[in-house]
Regions:
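Extracellular-facing segments of soluble proteins and assemblies that are Gly/Ser/Thr-biased and enriched
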Residues: 71-107
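Extreme N-terminal segments of fungal proteins
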Residues: 1-83
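Low-complexity or membrane-interfacial segments used for flexible interactions
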Residues: 1-34, 109-232
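Short beta-strand segments
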Residues: 63-66, 87-90, 113-115
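Predominantly extracellular/luminal cell-surface or secreted proteins
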Residues: 52-56, 106, 140
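Beta-strand elements of modular eukaryotic interaction domains
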Residues: 15, 41-42, 90-93, 126-127
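Ordered hydrophobic segments in well-structured contexts
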Residues: 38, 50-52, 102, 116, ...
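Eukaryote-biased feature marking scaffold/signaling PDZ-domain proteins and nuclear chromatin regulators
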Residues: 21, 46-48, 76, 96-98, ...
Length: 232
């Protein structure tokens, strides 16, 4: 798999949209002078991937990640994320009142761990935008930086959940009073690796999977793209 231009996955990314009302192609970068990835999005119910992430500031670069169309089966949405020859499935249920998104991944060689995106308006998310909302990625088999004490938001350690787990990534967008399917402009997207997600402990592929799963959830929460009945 081709890597980003400086051979390290960036810890922070934001989306840049060439057109404010077109979300089918956008660029991710640490800032407007350091554009790292191009993302194409196909919202039509056909067999093309939902998203493809390319290396560099155009879609002429190498394909780094493919994100399948989410498939709806018996109230469960499943999205396949492919990075090189490694794949995982991001899943969630419509009847899940906690709105959790789950996947598993091999980290540190052969050890498989479970991860969970949880909705959040905590400090890690609020740092990204004024009036932000988003999700935090929780490493389920972990102890947070506050020795796993957890607790209420105002009291607990940064990058630790209320149940004492480690937060390894976050993504955020801006709150809006207008439903996503009625908005004419594109809601923003910011992403950041944190704690062991940032240190490299979770492996060289982790950043790509964290980013791809974050973009999939953003496409639903901010753009209203849900499940598909795939046609030719």
């Amino acid at each position: 798999m081709s890597a980003a231009s400086d051979d390290e996955f960036p810890c922070y990314l934001r989306a840049y949209f060439p057109c404010r009302i077109d979300y089918t192609k956008f660029i991710l970068g640490e800032d407007s002078h350091d554009l790292r990835f191009t993302v194409t999005l196909d919202p039509v119910p056909r067999k093309n991937p939902l998203m493809v992430i390319y290396d560099g500031p155009t879609d002429d670069g190498d394909t780094l990640v493919t994100i399948s169309k989410p498939k709806d089966h018996l109230g469960k949405l499943s999205t396949t994320i492919q990075v090189s020859d490694i794949a995982t499935v991001l899943s969630n249920r419509f009847d899940d009142i906690h709105r959790l998104y789950k996947f598993s991944l091999k980290v540190g060689g052969s050890r498989r761990e479970k991860f969970e995106w949880r909705p959040s308006e905590g400090k890690e998310v609020q740092e990204m935008f004024r009036h932000a909302k988003g999700y935090k990625l929780v490493r389920l088999k972990s102890v947070g930086p506050g020795a796993g004490k957890g607790g209420k938001r105002k009291d607990r350690q940064l990058d630790e959940t209320s149940d004492g787990k480690e937060v390894v990534a976050v993504w955020a967008t801006k709150k809006s009073l207008v439903p996503s399917n009625l908005r004419m402009d594109v809601k923003p997207f910011k992403f950041e690796l944190r704690a062991s997600g940032k240190s490299g402990e979770l492996g060289s592929e982790f950043g790509y999977f964290a980013l791809a799963t974050a973009l999939r959830i953003w496409s639903y929460k901010a753009l209203g793209i849900t499940g598909f009945r795939i046609t030719d």
